[in-house]
Amino acid sequence: MSEQTTTPEVDQTLDLNNEMQERRSKLAALRAQGNPFPNDFRRDSLSGDLHAEFGDKSADELAALGKRVKIAGRIMTRRIMGKASFATLQDMAGKIQVYVTRDDLPEGFYNEQFKKWDLGDIVGVEGTLFRTNTGELSVHVSDIRLLTKALRPLPEKHKGLTDQEARCRQRYLDLIANEESRKTFVTRTKVVAGIRKFLNDKRFMEVETPMMQVIPGGASARPFITHHNALDIDMYLRIAPELYLKRLVVGGFERVYEINRNFRNEGISVRHNPEFTMLEFYMAYADYIDLMDLTEEMLRTLAQDILGDTKIRYAKEGEEGLTIDFGQPFQRLSMVDSILKYNPDVTRDDLATLEKATAVAKRLHIELMKSWELGHVITAIFEETVEHMLLQPTFITEYPAAVSPLARRNDQNPDVTDRFEFFIGGRELANGFSELNDAEDQAERFQAQVDQKAAGDDEAMFYDADFVTALEHGLPPTAGQGIGIDRLVMLFTNSHTIRDVILFPALRPQK
């Protein structure tokens, strides 16, 4: 007879099935005794609050206080020692230990109920705060109830949920098992709240603009297409809210912002998710220099308020990392000057004509499109050779007009615009510019984009006639900016991939 063997994966599946069957049997027994999912327990305390308020109290002080609490949470660990047990409960604010004894509970409850509960079960506890012999703040339980029976076990304590894709697919398990993941998303919430407070304090008004648009605009990107049955028209998930926000400035809302989703039908990478969150804001009677000043102030404020310091550590995966200092003035360089700084063998004259710049790009093995103008080529050289070098906070200014169809031309040099992109950690974080408010110039640039689309550029913009009409009514001198919330959170949490800061990122369906 041949010997049969199983793989570790099969063994794990068998173990899981056996444990789930055992848990289902326990649930069936609980159902026979009543409702195993009650909803009448009300807590009055959170673990983190108890540690904050009573963490420095001595055992004698706690005994004198006799503080009664009602807490609820998930059983994360448990040590059964005959007639007494210790368990760790986890709630939204952290963890706290509870001490359960047979003699403090109704007769038979400890052995027949409590000892049969499992890790992952959710319980409600009432008891008194005390400090154990080892000095740990704990709750001496006088009453404990099962509130939710978990049918699946938690990830193993030491192995945890370490596979990146599994963490994204089962974010609920990731949040249960990984404290760092929970901290990341708490920080994300604080970042968004901090931005709102900062802008509200400066008299910006938060607004909402359409997520489905007849004409996608405001950025160069490939949109998602859907169909509106009642109107029988194709519509696009928005790639940016920009053109609608500027319509509001025309209408008299002179400081507006929106924090919401954008959708771009593009590739997925450590920096890109097809559905992502952006802050866009617009200020009348301001220019791109005002925006750079405002951005410095906002990021410095967020770092100090959320992280407690203007200096943060940041490292891309596999790299040693660096200290990023928001407390110092941010570097400001024109695009051409940045190319010259990081490419000592390139001269200003090398970038003066399309022919010369193309020769530089070919020498650097940069792919170009035949329809590109000089501005496109200079931008491609910058993106390939400079962008990843911009580790400390840096504004790159004077973007070519050819790649900035919505930005105002510079008064001294109409070939470039009053535009900047903000880089940090070698990655783009923000894009802002003095807005183009010349309706005739805007119409010409839209037409140039249409020509580029006809030449094969799928990311070129559509012609938005209604937006041109809005400009014809008069847009005051305005500056506007977009900041990627996901990338900002990556920076503040030292996360290596955008999937770590989006609760439910896009993934290919499992077969």
UniProtKB/Swiss-Prot annotation:
Highest taxon, organism lineage: Bacteria
GO cellular component term, pick one: cytosol
Keyword annotations of the record: Aminoacyl-tRNA synthetase, ATP-binding, Cytoplasm, Ligase, Magnesium, Metal-binding, Nucleotide-binding, Protein biosynthesis
GO biological process, one term: lysyl-tRNA aminoacylation
Enzyme Commission designation: 6.1.1.6
Residues binding Mg(2+) 2, per UniProt: E428
GO terms for MF: ATP binding; lysine-tRNA ligase activity; magnesium ion binding; tRNA binding
Cofactor, how bound (note): Binds 3 Mg(2+) ions per subunit.
Annotated binding of Mg(2+) 1, by residue: E421, E428
Catalytic activity: tRNA(Lys) + L-lysine + ATP = L-lysyl-tRNA(Lys) + AMP + diphosphate
Cofactor: Mg(2+)
UniProt main location, coarse: cytoplasm
A Pfam family that the UniProt record links to this protein: tRNA-synt_2
Family: Belongs to the class-II aminoacyl-tRNA synthetase family.
Protein name: Lysine--tRNA ligase
The species this protein was found in: Aeromonas hydrophila subsp. hydrophila (strain ATCC 7966 / DSM 30187 / BCRC 13018 / CCUG 14551 / JCM 1027 / KCTC 2358 / NCIMB 9240 / NCTC 8049)
Gene: lysS
